[in-house]
A protein has these predicted regions:
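RecA-like P-loop NTPase motor core of helicase/translocase proteins
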Residues: 1-186
Length: 186
């Protein structure tokens, strides 16, 4: 007598349900929409320094010393714009505020246990230009701290690396201000 046509998934429900692991960025859909609207409306709510930087980075033609045309990739632009929008426009300073404000399903809301310091991240693929986004964020913070005399912005920065390979790459990019001299940042 043949067995029933049960599959492994039927025998162990939930074992192959990967949806909990795919929900690592629950705020992204709402933020992506809001940031696009904010961009289309001319970056309202930012300092004059931030507006100058955004216009320079994304609305100015850049030529490298090699005479090659340079533009930031769309993922890099979206990452720094989102960071600026969340920090400067919406003034979100905790993961709790971020989750409560932008998560679409409040039933899945799990507030972090330790949330005393503002922490921001961008989730970007390998080779998509995370180091360039880091340099954009540093320039944005530094010049707002200096030009706007605003204590909400930093003048000193700590860059952490997950391993020696990444550390060596970051060191070669940032050592001696190389990335700030080679890229059109300011």
């Amino acid at each position: 007598m043949p067995r029933g046509s049960k599959t492994i998934a039927d025998a162990q429900p939930g074992l192959f349900d990967l949806s909990p692991f795919l929900k690592t960025a629950p705020c992204v859909p709402a933020l992506r929409k809001l940031v696009a609207e904010w961009r289309d409306n001319g970056y309202k709510g930012v300092t004059s320094t931030t507006r100058t930087l955004l216009n320079y980075w994304f609305f100015t033609d850049h030529r490298l010393p090699t005479c090659q045309l340079f533009t930031y990739h769309e993922a890099q632009r979206e990452a720094i714009e989102t960071l600026i929008y969340v920090y400067e426009v919406e003034q979100v300073r905790s993961r709790k505020d971020l989750l409560e404000k932008y998560i679409s399903s409040k039933t899945e809301l799990r507030l972090p246990a330790y949330d005393e310091f503002a922490r921001y991240c961008t989730k970007m693929a390998t080779g998509s230009g995370k180091t360039k986004v880091m340099s954009l964020a540093i320039v944005w913070h530094y010049f707002n701290a200096v030009r706007e005399n605003d204590n909400d912005f930093a003048k000193t920065f700590l860059i952490l690396a997950p391993n020696v390979i990444v550390f060596d790459r970051l060191r070669s990019d940032f050592e001696g201000g190389r990335i700030f001299n080679n890229d059109p940042l300011m």
